């Protein structure tokens, strides 16, 4: 039985991934904000974590360490957005929050759990199509997600051959992320994108749903991707073709 830790497990993609991995026999450890875990209880071991708080990360890591197991997989889904605005109109507090929540916190939580990984383990991070296909108003988020790609490739080199490290980079996904984010809002804010307009401009005619993302993540966790590291899988229905 493989053991997989998922940071951001209570979000829209995370909940589907928990169910899929559990159904396939994996031992899943879910980590997320306490508010998220209360709002969306999961049928697996759940540990509260706030990736913006180093003490919280240390506490969560120590709890996992106390379980006396090795992680075969680590998926870091954490992240959120704070609306759409041009960079020149963005205040520093919003910029800092965006970088902290989408890059620094992801780096810190991944770094602390990394020593618990098993030999030949797999780490999957979550970037975004915006890291390469820039859209006005999403600059800070795009900068953070471009950093995730750089982090992923760096870890892939530095941790080889012991670990594989890859990323998925979705376009917009039909989850609460588009309406404020799980755990950091009531999940009922106005959608940050025009879904119909974006869907009509996408070759496959819609935006993603969670299973469009969880399938590639499970592939990257599995032995089927055993000769892949430092790679980015773009999941966007053809909206961006590198």
Where are these regions (language model features)?
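Residue(s) in the substrate-gating loop at a strand-loop-helix junction
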Residues: 128
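Substrate-binding pocket helix/loop in short-chain dehydrogenase/reductase
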Residues: 85-87, 91-99, 198
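Alpha-helical segment proximal to the catalytic Tyr-Lys
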Residues: 115, 157-161, 226
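Canonical Rossmann dinucleotide-binding motif of NAD(H)/NADP(H)-dependent dehydrogenases/reductases
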Residues: 2-27
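Short C-terminal tail/terminal secondary-structure segment
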Residues: 84, 218, 229-242
């Amino acid at each position: 039985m493989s053991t997989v830790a998922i940071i951001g497990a209570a979000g829209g993609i995370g909940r589907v991934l928990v169910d899929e991995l559990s159904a396939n026999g994996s031992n899943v450890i879910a980590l997320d904000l306490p508010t998220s875990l209360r709002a969306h209880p999961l049928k697996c071991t759940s540990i509260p974590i706030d990736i913006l708080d180093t003490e919280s990360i240390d506490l969560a890591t120590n709890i996992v360490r106390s379980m006396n197991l090795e992680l075969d997989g680590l998926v870091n889904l954490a992240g959120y957005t704070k609306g759409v605005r041009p960079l020149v109109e963005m205040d520093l507090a919003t910029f800092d929050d965006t970088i902290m929540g989408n890059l620094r916190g992801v780096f810190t939580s991944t770094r602390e759990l990394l020593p618990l990984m098993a030999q030949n383990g797999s780490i999957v991070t979550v970037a975004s199509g915006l890291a390469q296909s820039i859209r006005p108003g999403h600059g800070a988020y795009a900068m953070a997600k471009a950093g995730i790609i750089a982090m992923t490739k760096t870890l892939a080199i530095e941790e080889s051959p012991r670990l594989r490290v890859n990323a998925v980079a979705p376009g917009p996904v039909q989850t609460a992320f588009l309406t404020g984010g799980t755990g950091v809002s009531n999940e009922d804010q106005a959608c940050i994108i025009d879904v119909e307009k974006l869907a009509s401009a996408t070759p496959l005619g819609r935006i993603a749903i969670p299973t469009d993302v969880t399938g590639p993540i499970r592939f990257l966790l599995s032995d089927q991707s055993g000769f892949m590291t430092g790679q980015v899988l773009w999941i966007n229905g053809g909206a961006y073709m590198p």
